[in-house]
Amino acid sequence: AYAAAPFAPDAVRAVLPHLSLLVLNAVEAEQLRAATGEGVGALGLAHVLVTLGAEGCLWLHEGREWRFAAPRVEAVDTTGAGDTFTGFALALLDEGREMPEAVALAQKAAALKVTRAGAADAIPARAEAERFGEAPEAG
């Protein structure tokens, strides 16, 4: 896996042949297209995740494209949202989770992160991300 932030065309080109997963945001995806002349879907990678901020995430795999909507929240500070998403997604994939499950929890974590001011100190715990969006228990 490789997260292309900050984007450096030569660095990305150098690692592409060794990747099975590339994670980048929409701006970086456009920069990569400009640098290589190809869209991210034409790079021959097994998996590409493109984060789209409040619009969610795009997963490219085996010539297909899946879009995942992001949870709707009131953003306070978007610093670290992409890092939160990437960290959660990679940790879950490393556990053997399937991509849709990894993306779903990573998006919950990133959505929670942006509701708080700060960077690393505002990243939610996994249990908190897992509970996010659940209906409260009846009391």
Predicted regions and their residues:
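Conserved beta-alpha-beta core of the PfkB/ribokinase-like small-molecule kinase fold
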Residues: 1-39, 55-57
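Conserved phosphate-binding/catalytic region of the ribokinase-like
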Residues: 36-139
